[in-house]
A protein has these predicted regions:
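Bacterial N-terminal signal peptides
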Residues: 14-24
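Bacterial N-terminal signal peptides that target proteins for export
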Residues: 3-15
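Terminal presequence/propeptide segments associated with secretion/organelle targeting
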Residues: 25-376
Length: 376
């Protein structure tokens, strides 16, 4: 365990050194436009990624200010246009966090839309509210925001799943119904293991699971200041002080959907941690490794003698960790035995303490099911 702890310290040092260089290229001094300067009729542009890592722009027109319209205060009503918006059918899932500029000044992030519209109109979260996330060291209460009653809804954040099958994702959704997860099956891009610097308009992922299986949400970076970033413009899960893994993201394309268009992307290299998930967005830091729980899963099918071993890292969270770990195991079982139906399973697990001061906890059990041993 001492070797593991030394390796983790070494990894954090290397990661911080590497991304010190990346951040120096991505951070540029930007002037903010305060909300009291924003007037109806003003025009500007927004930035986002529609394919690959290339940042594109599209026009924005300010329609007004919605006082106390959002969970963190005022929101800015705007109309979006241009060839990109026409091509995508409006603001797509994954565009949340797209920075909006007027007269060269950063106004805020595209964050909310109206239900039952073509998504040409939406709300912008002011940048002043987003950068306050950097001053939240601990979990705190946030006033409730009833999106259902107002029909104003956060632009959905696509949940990209790589290495998981559809059955496992349906199982996950059933266990975490309150979050209304809508996972999208995806694959890896060719350069996913390469770290890229983030800038305003880049795609970014907040990941739960990393390794042989990956699961996380893709959105857009609003602002970068040295090693710190803010993104999304609205809460992801609203978990307050949290530790998600921060990753690069690659966008394959924007998929047009009758319900809502969405960015189809892959989760790339780990580049830092997301430590705030609150009303005005998410915030994180380059080069800082989020604590994670390493899990090794080995499954052997006695009928076919097929064996698979998967290794993942899962975020530390009292509510999410057990479900994410169980989903990862369930997925590995599904893919190894490659069938549904009855059977018998012998299950062994070993838990090791992080600091190595406690003895390993090992348990064995046997399960039988006539219907579906996978879910047992």
């Amino acid at each position: 365990m001492n070797k593991i702890r030394k390796f983790r310290r070494f990894a954090r040092t290397v990661m911080a050194a590497a991304f010190c260089c990346l951040a120096s290229f991505s951070a540029m001094a930007e002037t903010f436009m305060q909300i009291n300067e924003v007037q109806p009729g003003m025009t500007g542009y927004a930035k986002t990624v529609a394919h690959g890592r290339d940042i594109e722009t599209f026009p924005v027109e300010i329609l007004g200010i919605m006082k106390n319209g959002g969970p963190s205060g005022d929101l800015i009503l705007a109309r979006f246009s241009g060839p990109l918006i026409e091509e995508t059918g409006g603001i797509a899932q994954g565009m949340s966090g797209s920075p909006v500029y007027i007269d060269g000044k950063l106004v805020g992030a595209i964050a909310y839309g109206w239900s039952f519209t073509k998504s040409r109109m939406g709300m912008i979260t002011p940048i002043a509210d987003m950068v306050k996330l950097w001053n939240n060291p601990t979990r705190e209460e946030i006033p409730d925001f009833n999106a259902r009653e107002t029909q104003l809804i956060p632009i959905a954040t696509p949940l990209m799943a790589s290495g998981f099958d559809g059955v496992s994702m349906e199982w996950l959704k059933g266990k975490l119904k309150s979050y209304n997860f809508q996972p999208v099956d995806t694959a890896s891009a060719g350069d996913d293991d390469t770290a890229f610097p983030l800038q305003a308009g880049s795609s970014v992922a907040a990941a739960f699971v990393d390794g042989d299986m990956r699961l996380g949400a893709i959105g857009t970076v609003t602002y970068v200041d040295d090693n710190n970033i803010v993104a999304f413009g609205h809460p992801f899960l609203k978990r307050g002080s949290i530790n998600y893994f921060m990753h690069n993201a690659y966008i394959f394309t924007i998929v047009n959907n009758l319900d809502s268009s969405f960015k189809l992307g892959s989760i790339g290299a780990e580049i830092g941690k997301i430590d705030q998930d609150r009303g005005s967005g998410i915030a994180g830091e380059y080069g800082m490794t989020a604590p994670g729980i390493p899990v090794t899963i080995t499954v052997t099918d006695r009928d076919t003698q097929r064996l698979q071993t998967k290794r993942v890292k899962i975020i530390e969270d009292n509510e999410l960790t057990p479900v994410l770990a169980a989903t990862s195991v369930y997925n590995t079982v599904n893919k190894t035995i490659d069938r549904r139906g009855g059977g018998t399973a012998t299950f062994t697990y070993k838990i090791r303490s992080a600091d190595g001061t406690e003895k390993d906890i090992t348990r064995h059990n046997m399960y039988y099911s006539e219907d579906n041993i996978n879910e047992k």
